[in-house]
Amino acid sequence: MELILKYFPNLSDTQREQFAALKALYEDWNSKINVISRKDMDNFYEHHVLHSLAIAHEIRFREGTKVLDLGTGGGFPGIPLAIMFPDSQFKLIDRTGKKIRVVNEVAQAIGLKNVVAEQLSGEEEKAQYDFVVSRAVMPLPDLVKIIKKNVNRKNQHNSLPNGLICLKGGDLQAETKPFKNIVSLTEIHDMFKEESLVMPVCAASYTVRTSAARRGAVCGDEDGGEGRRDGRLRCWRPALRAGSGLSACGRRC
């Protein structure tokens, strides 16, 4: 818990209590249903909670923001984000019913009023949200295809354009190949000085914003863009046309 306060010192008393309660709750549920690797519970706050909160470092969801956590598993990143942003609304979905049971029980136990959890696949979820978040769910091209229908492109009221924010690892060279424009890539290690969190966060255009875990991430749109490579930071920005009124998402918003 001290690790969370190290990077987020301005938590309310309620938020502190909610974060502090998480480990015992997940240890109890993990003894019944394996939702987190049991050998990883000693690093619970670093590997799961703080990792999820890398998204909170990139964007502060404003009041009324609607967020879908696709493939939430045991509730990550959705539960930590819901604690961090009590005035935003979160829907957490997973195709595995026992994991959704854990999510519902944890949310109820810590008094989260802004979380709905349901057993659904990404393909089955039809509603629209300001942002879709995910954590190591599937190859990025597949993820983008699924979530395009779920992103509300009309109501833009956050500091970033509506879209996808995901924590993603693996061989990202192959995953990035179908995409042309990467908006930004940031190392999580630059946010949190913990040895095990050496992973980048990436943002992308096409109303899709992507955060990466461990090696990088992507997204893009069909418009041309200009890019730069700066050490471990790789950024691409949409090519803005004079008088086009384009936002950072690379499209008229």
At which residue positions do the language-model features occur?
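Conserved SAM/SAH cofactor-binding pocket of Class I
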Residues: 53-137, 144
